[in-house]
Amino acid sequence: FVLLTNAPRPNSTVIDFLKKMGLKKFYEDVYTSGEASLKYLMENFLNSKFYHIGPPRDFDLFKRFEQNKVSNINQADYFICTGLFEDHETKLEYYKDLLEKFSNKKFVCTNPDLIVDRGDVREFCAGSVAKIFEEIGGKVIYFGKPYPPVYNLSANINGKNVLCIGDNM
């Protein structure tokens, strides 16, 4: 079976992580929402400037075109959201203020989950920022479960039944 995850990272990063945990024998292949979004970006935005919304640990997803990353939001052609900034993890209002005047730009969400529970701590995910962008009138392109593109890209599933087991949104 294919392990499909909403991790905003390349397939290879997650495969390496699973191997270290001794889990290689439990799956045939791995496909991440990060890999799906990367494929889309390489095909559609290869030479465009982007502004990354998310923690630095997620930036390995964009190594192939990091020269297109801008630190000034005003210079961005589009946004890539992998999560929340480390210094703004709890206040979603920050993102509304940050993005309000940019609702005409594309917004790529690499993990549509709204929240994640890490032990006893509940944290916002990239999907929460994407929802705010939609609320201010922006258009979001989602990659990850439950959106169809990630299934279509992860395996040749046309005409096949798919069982998806998730934990939350």
Describe every region a protein language model picked out.
Residues F1-M169:
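HAD-like aspartate-dependent phosphatase fold
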